[in-house]
Amino acid sequence: NRDLVNYSHDNTRTSVGARLAMYEVGLKTYSPIGQSLEKRAEKIHELEEKEPRLSGALPFVDSHLHNDLIDTLSTRGIPGVALTILAFSAIFIYALRTAKEPYILILLFSLLVVGLSDVILFSKPVPTAVFVTIILLCAYFKVQSDQ
């Protein structure tokens, strides 16, 4: 609660304030076709000079913005967000229509919830492990349904 009060007084150097500042700078500095981390960092520094209240985001400009979709939008642009949504939608539809098993939905829901406040898809090993797990679950349920 204190973090939100600080944020409302333009102090983003708190845990919640920094996250909200990261979300804001990500949305304000994205490029529709994507951009490098260096270009994004440059834009964030320029934005912070104009809006010093966003300084809580500065320690994170070289890594990620603590939200999967905003981080994807800020570096991979609209096509990256569209592909991310398409991938999650395909898994969701498969889980509902074909597998009819809750485990895939639970995994997908967990990824979406955690992705709202942190970045899961940022490093290559994590999404690889997640998608391999989903593929293995799908194969397992297919074998079970064939028996």
Predicted features, each with a name:
Residues 45, 49, 92, 133:
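Short Asp/Glu-rich motifs
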Residues 65-68, 73-80, 121-130:
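Membrane-interface micro-motifs in multi-pass membrane enzymes
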